[in-house]
Curated annotation (Swiss-Prot):
Protein name: Uncharacterized protein YhzC
InterPro entries, A to Z: IDEAL_dom, Virus_scaffolding_prot_C
A Pfam family per the record: IDEAL
Species, as recorded: Bacillus subtilis (strain 168)
SMART domains: IDEAL
């Protein structure tokens, strides 16, 4: 014969599952935030290096393009 669970046991089990799903979702959000921050910082560092290189080479067009991109990225912060 099958073992039947009471209504209370079923609800407790269901709430536990929902909590676990919520925890996974929050973990995923946190991981995404860390990755986004890392990519943002890396892009800023790359743009800074490219801007410095453009200044060293006196490349005005590259400097203007890169500095606009840098400013837009900083503004989106």
């Amino acid at each position: 014969m099958k073992e039947k669970k009471s209504y209370t046991e079923l609800m407790k089990s269901r709430n536990t599952q929902k909590t676990k799903e919520f925890d996974v979702t929050m973990t995923d959000i946190y991981i995404q935030m860390v990755l986004d921050e890392s990519l943002y910082n890396r892009r800023l560092a790359m743009l800074t290096d490219q801007i410095n290189k453009a200044l060293d080479e006196k490349d005005k067009d590259a400097f203007l393009t890169l500095s606009k991109e840098y400013a837009a990225l900083k503004q989106s912060e």
